[in-house]
């Protein structure tokens, strides 16, 4: 008998090529910071400002798009990258009241409740929210505003499995097969947002009841030689056979990673060299917020508007390999062609993540790495 699932995956659809997901809105505290109104003239080419964006190392936009923003507003954006989104959030919480920057990007729906509970963000109801479907607006206090959406999934090296005559995994449960021993690398959920998303995917899939639970699954993965890397970059560009020349042909990455492998290849192949295990996918949204304590509130708000606007949104797919959320944006046809769009991505309600995330991570640590 299959194990009882505490959470079930829900059928989703794309609206205007954008994934729309129904996730319960995160519970929010009553103490909400409000961005102060600037008393000095707003930023402009004649009144230039510099702001710092705290983000993960995968943040990217085209130079010409950022340059156009600077030319129009007089705002220069400096990046302070902190590895993974989980690390960026941890550092921002530790520096509360004396923020490392002015704006933070990369907090996702798995980390949202933690960021809101820490009360490190100012509220800002951007006028650009009117162009974003309600499905993506998970924070009704407007401290975290939606920017992108994608799916965290198992990726595998197609050539490795073909050359070695091994069947690639088709489900999470397949990862415990002795035939796949020593082939998987994941990220630590304590420090990595895709790592946390994959942990939540296992909880959604295997649940807590019955003879086989999510804890059983991870115990079996440990016995089957799973490797744990600190973050996505180390796993994908270090351990993964295709991208990093490592010895692990299965990695936790994104549904949009295969089109990235096509886009950057010279010459471009007819088919992607990597593939996605659709049954493993967990829906992920990323958000932007203004850090409390910034001295550049007006400039920070203008940058948030820029990220939510069509110019930046159209630039997101081929730079960060996720889908935009603005309903007026148009993802490139080639990006859509090579991206797998899961029919039934796994999900865990935000309220459950908020209540149990730290305990789940602690249990995972006890099972997998201690």
Language-model-detected regions and their locations in the chain:
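Short beta-strand->loop
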Residues: 121-130, 144-145, 173-176, 255, ...
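Periplasmic solute-binding protein
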Residues: 109-120, 139-167, 195-205, 283-289
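Mature extracytoplasmic/periplasmic domains
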Residues: 282, 291-347
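Early extracytoplasmic/lumenal segment of secretory-pathway proteins
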Residues: 28-29, 38-114, 370
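A structural signal for short loop-to-beta-strand junctions that line the ligand-binding cleft
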Residues: 99-104, 122-158, 173, 182-189
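Extracellular/periplasmic bilobal clamshell ligand-binding domains
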Residues: 333-370
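Ligand-binding pocket segment of bilobal, Venus flytrap-like solute-binding proteins
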Residues: 194-279
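Short, low-complexity disordered leader/linker segments with a strong preference
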Residues: 1-50
């Amino acid at each position: 008998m299959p194990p009882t699932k505490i959470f079930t995956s829900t059928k989703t659809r794309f609206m205007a090529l954008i994934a729309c997901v129904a996730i319960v809105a995160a519970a929010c505290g009553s103490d909400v910071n409000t961005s102060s109104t600037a008393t000095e003239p707003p930023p402009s080419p004649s009144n230039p400002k510099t702001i710092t964006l705290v983000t993960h190392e995968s943040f990217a936009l085209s130079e010409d798009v950022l340059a156009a923003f600077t030319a129009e507003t007089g705002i220069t954006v400096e990046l302070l990258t902190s590895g993974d989104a989980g690390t960026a959030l941890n550092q921002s919480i530790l520096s509360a009241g004396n923020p490392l920057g002015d704006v933070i990007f990369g907090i996702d729906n798995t980390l949202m409740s933690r960021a809101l509970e820490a009360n490190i963000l100012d509220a800002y109801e951007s006028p650009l929210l009117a162009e974003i479907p309600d499905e993506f607006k998970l924070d009704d206090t407007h401290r975290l505003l939606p920017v992108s959406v994608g799916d965290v999934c198992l990726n595998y090296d197609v050539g490795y499995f073909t050359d070695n005559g091994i069947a690639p995994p088709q489900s999470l449960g397949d990862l415990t097969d002795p035939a796949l021993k020593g082939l998987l690398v994941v990220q630590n959920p304590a420090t990595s947002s895709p790592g946390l998303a994959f942990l939540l995917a296992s909880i959604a899939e295997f649940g807590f009841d019955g003879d086989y639970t999510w804890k059983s699954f991870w115990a079996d993965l440990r016995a089957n030689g799973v490797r744990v890397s600190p973050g996505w970059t180390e796993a994908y560009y270090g351990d993964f056979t295709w991208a990093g020349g490592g010895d692990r042909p299965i990695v936790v990455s994104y549904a949009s990673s295969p089109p990235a492998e096509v886009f950057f290849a010279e010459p471009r192949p007819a088919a992607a060299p990597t593939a996605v295990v659709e049954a493993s996918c967990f829906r992920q949204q990323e958000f932007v917020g203004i850090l409390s304590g910034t001295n550049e509130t007006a400039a920070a708000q203008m940058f948030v508007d820029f990220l939510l606007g069509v110019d930046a949104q159209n630039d997101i797919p081929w730079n960060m390999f996720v889908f935009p959320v603005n309903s007026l944006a148009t993802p490139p046809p080639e990006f859509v062609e090579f991206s797998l769009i899961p029919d039934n991505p796994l999900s865990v309600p935000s309220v459950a993540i908020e209540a149990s995330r730290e305990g789940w991570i602690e249990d995972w640590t006890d099972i997998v790495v201690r």
